[in-house]
Amino acid sequence: MTDQTTRLPVRRALISVSDKTGVVDFARELEALGVEILSTGGTFKLLRENGIAAIEVADYTGFPEMMDGRVKTLHPKIHGGILGRRDLDGAVMAEHGIAPIDLVAVNLYPFAATVAKPGCTLPDAIENIDIGGPTMVRSAAKNHKDVAIVVNAEDYAAVVDNLKNGGLTYAQRFDLALKAFEHTAGYDGMIANYLGGIDQSTEQLSTDNRSLFPRTYNMQFIKAQDMRYGENPHQQAAFYVEKPDEACVATARQLQGKELSFNNVADTDAALECVKSFTKPACVIVKHANPCGVAVVPENEGGIRKAYDLAYATDSESAFGGIIAFNRELDGETAQAIVERQFVEVIIAPKVSQAARDVVASKANVRLLECGEWPAERSPGWDYKRVNGGLLIQSRDIGMITEADLKIVTQRAPTEQEIHDLIFAWKVAKFVKSNAIVYAKNRQTVGVGAGQMSRVNSARIAAIKAEHAGLQVQGAVMASDAFFPFRDGIDNAAKAGITAVIQPGGSMRDNEVIAAADEAGIAMVFTGMRHFRH
């Protein structure tokens, strides 16, 4: 049985890295500890230029680097030194003059960066598939009982600190080995994804028309937390994250409150992604992944405090136990209004002031998240939906429209105010479960109908919600995430007092729907873009 606490010293290390961040300082620390350093290629040159007495692998093995660097470390003196079991293979190693290598610091050719370059050819990609690196990494990781493997520059300092304290424990070497296997798994996955997208239907393979969807799909997510349970208490769950390009729930920092639940994460994602759609101060309140209240206010006209008041007024009942997201720094006044007015599960904002933190601290269970700023232009990416026996993959729905994209299809054109409200309502409808209907006025939701099997019933629910909240539908606009299959949706909207409608268009009965709008004096615009959300 392996001793979990015994520290193993390092007498010989092999360093060969593509990412040279921190490697000189790391090697210098090892040298100061009396460690003999073997190295290759550019790493060897860099170390020697910085006064570190590294030994080139070709000199160590007596076998030259060859084939344009394809064969450097693939030698028994290297792999025997890494893979040799100290308690079993000592005699064989001595017989063949193989010295043990106790630490391997390797990271791999930058395949992802290479294939991301414009004009990257298949030969370019192939030449950047590392062979010797993964072989050493896997060898060292397999023999972690006797060898430490370091694939991440972020681990250099901790490794040095432990060596100064006598060496690395088995538990530490095991953790480094796990990171190594994760590293090579991700690397091989990238290669398989890239090559799997190449069109093989022609004799001359080319990267020109590479498919976005490879033959096998490989992704790597890192566990952020285990959860008490999933969507329901009888389901097990965990939260895994990738490395996103923008601020999101996965990157958010929790400042206080209970641990996030499975449903908290899903609902917070919905709220934050919705509020990102707006450039002016905005508040989004979400319940069960649906916006139940959204408002946007002009700059210098009350800020997020006013936006929160208006969003809350849409549906104060549903806001109870909801998620609140802002696109501006959370201030103390707004935080005070929230905690005095309602029970809230999560509050998320790009930044949280100290005054707001002090206020929310009075409600210890409230989860307060700070996610950082996001760019105006949304990052492309992928959405996944698990089905029994498979996985659906699609590009993220980041499609948006501007006033220039609107096609006026009715006799009456919308007023300037109606256009502002139509675009606002359209942005909200994108985040409402289909069939989605949103009533809005003065960039405030006045009624939201979500998740109904018939579109007309979603419209009826939006009207009921508005009436229940005491909000005026007369003069409001309506957004629909998909086309109206029949005129009844417009007829009901007219009875409720709707004056303008935004929808994708594209129904076989568009003419009937347009006629219904004209009969009621309703202005209607088509976007040509659908926003189903399931």
From Swiss-Prot:
Catalytic reactions of this protein: (6R)-10-formyltetrahydrofolate + 5-amino-1-(5-phospho-beta-D-ribosyl)imidazole-4-carboxamide = 5-formamido-1-(5-phospho-D-ribosyl)imidazole-4-carboxamide + (6S)-5,6,7,8-tetrahydrofolate; IMP + H2O = 5-formamido-1-(5-phospho-D-ribosyl)imidazole-4-carboxamide
Highest taxon, organism lineage: Bacteria
Pathway(s) it belongs to: Purine metabolism; IMP biosynthesis via de novo pathway; 5-formamido-1-(5-phospho-D-ribosyl)imidazole-4-carboxamide from 5-amino-1-(5-phospho-D-ribosyl)imidazole-4-carboxamide (10-formyl THF route): step 1/1; Purine metabolism; IMP biosynthesis via de novo pathway; IMP from 5-formamido-1-(5-phospho-D-ribosyl)imidazole-4-carboxamide: step 1/1
SMART domains in the cross-refs: AICARFT_IMPCHas (SM00798), MGS (SM00851)
Location of the MGS-like domain: 6-151
The entry's keywords: Hydrolase, Multifunctional enzyme, Purine biosynthesis, Transferase
Keyword Transferase in annotation: yes
Comment text on domains: The IMP cyclohydrolase activity resides in the N-terminal region.
Protein's name according to its UniProt entry: Bifunctional purine biosynthesis protein PurH
The species this protein was found in: Stutzerimonas stutzeri (strain A1501) (Pseudomonas stutzeri)
Organism placement in taxonomy: Bacteria, Pseudomonadati, Pseudomonadota, Gammaproteobacteria, Pseudomonadales
This protein's encoding gene: purH
